[in-house]
């Protein structure tokens, strides 16, 4: 094992220990074994860069259909949208969820198409720096199903877009209102998620969520678009293949280029509460981080050493 790999391993161990005992006193997070909301899908939020920001058409006044693959099934959902990194309010005129027929095309099963409401309204405005969670919605789906979340955006202009830049899944954008269309011809196909934070489902007592937090390794670097080949995806498949673990959902919180003390997006030490501790239903956590803290040549590592 060369020195760089050894340092990465040691740093990962230190990171795990430090996160487990951050602050002046150790924190013990108690989780209750009872029915409640559990995260069946999620992504780690960050700012969309120029290459990940849609143009011609942009999101303003247009339709965006995004796909997700859930880890456990359910019959009730809550959808959380994020404008955490935005600097202006984002207006969304409508949100719908449906079963996706094929990960490579925007066609949905129209018989499953369901409106997602916020405080009883179809329209929602997400203030800058905030997240919103939908009403409880009746919607039935099975573990490992592919779902489509379709949004029709309003007249917000400019501003920073909150996204997960490396979705490794197709997102389809078309001009105008295609919110309830069974399918449409996209004018732009991106591979980022926009304003889409998490999907929760109601689970019975004994349900658990495991969070996978890390950098590009966790985020599926170099994996095939629409193949859902992150290690967290494979973990979800294996958990569902065993009757004893079908009650465990998987929440992926990797960010390519992320680091313990910096890197791309919010540093792992600063997002741990948001992306692990506060994830609905969390019981377990896999931490794989540290290589980017020592991998960038010529950078000052004084903070890392400290």
For each predicted feature, which ranges?
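C-terminal motif of bacterial Sec signal peptides marking the signal peptidase cleavage site
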Residues: 17-21
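Conserved SGNH/GDSL esterase-like catalytic core that processes O-acyl groups on lipids
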Residues: 63-66, 89, 97-104, 175-192, ...
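Bacterial N-terminal signal peptides that target proteins for export
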Residues: 1-10
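N-terminal secretory targeting modules
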Residues: 24-213, 223-225, 244
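Low-complexity, intrinsically disordered short peptide segments enriched in small/polar/basic residues
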Residues: 10-11, 26, 283
